[in-house]
Design a protein with these regions (language model features):
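Mid-domain, small-residue-enriched loop/turn segments at the edges of structured enzyme/sensor domains
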Residues: 353, 436-440, 444, 450, ...
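Aromatic- and glycine-rich peptidoglycan recognition patches
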Residues: 131-137, 251-254, 280-329, 582-584, ...
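Beta-loop motif signature
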Residues: 39-42, 48-78, 119-156, 210
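Catalytic cysteine-centered active-site loop
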Residues: 209-224, 228-261, 523
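Boundary regions of SH3-family modules and the immediately adjacent low-complexity/disordered segments
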Residues: 36-44, 89-118, 131, 157-201
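Beta-lactamase-like hydrolase cores
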Residues: 326-373
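Structured C-terminal helix/loop/strand segments within mature extracytoplasmic catalytic/sensor domains
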Residues: 320-346, 462-464, 507-538, 543-546, ...
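SH3/SH3-like beta-barrel superfamily modules
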Residues: 66-99, 139-177
Length: 613
């Protein structure tokens, strides 16, 4: 809902102070530059917030849901405009809609020596003159708001107070009591300070009401409170609790038994993080909650609204004890042993036989089970075909823009006799081009993302199965056998099938993103295509829905097998390979469903191990 205390912006006056303000890039951005998440692409336009507190909306409509809040002096990036609204990106990366009246556009770099007044009290009044009694405030601004410093006055208002003359983003000037602000050079970073100071600062807001989307003492939601505490201590966290839990590079995993005051606890269900609190020690937390009297509270962790829903703990990077690791440990040897036992149990309960291979591409640690068990490759064989195409593009003997004739006629591996394949829904985009031509890039993409057998046979006929096999061998995956086109019944009858095992397919997937035998451009293209996969019911479906992980993968499914081979890229940039090959599940839909469900459970278990402290 919209905050009724949000003041309207005023028409700007082009004063020298306003000109200085227009030159301000944003105190917030430079102040927190080192602490901010990875920067988005360069903005086309920037603007400064002119309202004391302004709601951001999910749609260009002030009756829509509130997504976030921004405050005076913050800088936003303009993404698009519509009638009376702009779609903006905040410094923390949140994208939402804001009324145009709350913006001052035309932001350019700040002049050298620019100083700002940053509000440090819960609220500060800005007056037209240096007096508490001469007139009502022009506006009241919350902690964290920033204004350009113009002058410092020593008790010139007769109020036994020193005053600071400031420039407001809408072009006006005013006065604020010096005790309510910190005067800082534009370039200066706020100090991280200590957990005791974070906690003391957070307790200043006790009793502030719970407000969905709120980030100020007028009202906080749970993540808005945490973000404000750390923002005023030099750390710009992501806006939402699930983002902080899984996607924020400034936070690292920590075990519950190693919690320190100032650590963050995240709560929710197995598939949704929707609350967070700050650990105070002695079983107490600081939170903004809807329970009890909705607002900022100090609460016991073991309350029925918290302890049963605890999921993860995180620590601000730089707050660990000396010598303690500040990262997820990934797949250590000890963890690999424990994880192998978990995966073995899931496989046993599924009724299927699984070939499993897991490798942490950062630590190099791996685990496997039945990883040399050879199975029909099904459509997983299409990844080696793609890599041979990309190798040839690197060599200059093919181009992804080459136009390839599209026809449903292929030669059997056995005797060269012609055959055609039965066309399915996955072939529809390629089928539309029958009798014409399609680019090699189109065919390779369709081969992977929609698993088109028509596209596969066209590409494999172009590059040759023997060449695919030679490059697959060179990539360290000789147990992956690419022998023939799809639906070559004569070859099938003679037992000439495409085959794989989990270890070999893991080597192929790792090569797709890491092998020096492919150029960086080729690896990037392989990732782009694999990450565009449209069949996502196994490994991707097992990940936490809010994880922020991206999966590049290829599935394979025929009557007797159910496969998924992947590279999973975590938000912190780490990658791991996960290959799950299943057969002997009864070749019926119930057996297949159990195998798919087991693959999802294994995927979740591997992901949990990779993000653990």
């Amino acid at each position: 809902m919209r905050d009724s205390m949000t003041p309207a912006s005023h028409a700007a006056r082009h004063t020298p102070l306003a000109a200085t303000l227009l030159a301000l890039l944003s105190f917030e951005e430079n102040l927190l530059l080192a602490a901010a998440p990875a920067a988005p692409p360069a903005p086309q336009e920037t603007a400064i917030i002119t309202a004391a507190v302004q709601d951001l909306f999910t749609r260009p409509d002030e009756t829509s849901s509130v997504d976030d809040q921004v405050i005076l002096g913050e800088r936003v990036e303009i993404l698009e405009d519509t009638a009376g609204f702009a779609r903006v990106r905040t410094a923390a990366g949140e994208v939402a809609w804001i009324p145009e009246r709350a913006l001052r556009r035309g932001v350019t770099p700040a002049p050298a020596g620019t100083k700002v007044a940053r509000v440090t009290s819960n609220f500060a009044h800005v007056y037209a003159s240096p007096s508490f009694t001469a007139q009502k405030p022009l506006l009241s601004v919350p902690v964290g708001a920033t204004m350009v410093l113009s002058d410092f006055l020593e008790d010139k208002g007769g109020d036994a107070s020193s005053w600071v003359r400031v420039g407001l983003p809408d072009g006006r000037s005013g006065f604020v009591a010096s005790r309510d602000v910190a005067l800082l050079p534009f370039e200066e970073n706020l100090p991280l300070r200590s957990p005791s100071e974070w906690i003391s600062f957070g307790k200043r807001f006790l009793g502030a009401p719970y407000t969905w989307g709120g980030t100020t003492p007028l009202g906080f939601d749970c993540s808005g409170l945490v973000q404000r505490i750390f923002r005023e201590h030099g750390v710009l966290l992501k806006r939402n609790s699930y983002e902080q839990a899984f996607q924020d590079s400034r936070l690292v995993p920590v075990s519950f038994d190693k919690l320190q005051p100032g650590d963050l606890l995240f709560f929710g269900t197995e598939d949704k993080i929707d609350h967070e609190a700050m650990w105070l020690g002695d079983g107490m937390v600081l939170q903004s909650t809807r329970h009890g009297v909705p607002g900022v509270q100090v609460t016991r962790y073991d309350s029925p609204f918290l302890k049963p829903l605890f999921r993860y703990a995180r620590r601000v990077r730089g707050n660990s004890s000396k010598g303690e690791e500040e990262k997820a440990s990934g797949l250590t040897r000890a963890r690999a042993r424990d994880l192998e036992a978990v995966l073995r149990g899931i496989a046993a309960s599924s009724g299927a036989r699984f070939g499993i291979y897991v490798k942490d591409l950062t630590t190099g640690s791996s685990l496997s089970r039945n990883s040399s068990l050879s199975m029909h490759a099904a459509s997983t064989m299409k990844t080696p075909v793609m890599l041979e195409v990309l190798r040839r593009v690197d060599a200059g003997t093919l181009s992804l823009s080459d136009e390839i004739p599209v026809k449903n006629e292929f030669k059997s591996l056995v005797d060269g006799s012609p055959f055609s394949i039965g066309l399915e829904e996955s072939d529809a985009p390629t089928m539309k081009k029958l009798g014409g031509k399609a680019s090699l890039e189109f065919l390779v993409t369709e081969m992977i993302v929609r698993s088109s057998s028509l596209a596969t046979n066209l590409v494999l006929s172009l590059v040759g199965a023997e060449n695919v096999q030679a490059f697959t061998d060179a990539l360290g995956a000789p147990t992956v056998k690419v022998r023939r086109c799809v639906e070559d019944s004569k070859a099938f009858d003679l037992g000439l099938n495409n085959e794989t095992d989990a270890a070999g397919m893991a080597a192929v997937m790792e090569a797709a993103v890491r092998s020096p035998k492919l150029s960086a451009a080729a690896r990037a293209k392989a990732w782009e295509i694999l990450a565009g996969q449209t069949f996502n019911e196994e490994i991707p479906a097992g990940l936490h829905p809010q994880s922020g992980a991206v999966v590049g993968h290829k599935t394979g499914s025929i009557s007797s097998v159910e496969h998924d081979a992947s590279v999973v890229r975590l938000p912190d940039g780490r990658e791991y390979v996960l290959v799950l090959l299943a057969n002997d599940f009864g070749a019926n839909e119930e057996g297949r469903r159990k195998a798919i469900d087991a693959a999802r459970k294994m995927s979740r278990a591997v992901w949990e191990a990779m993000i653990a402290p």
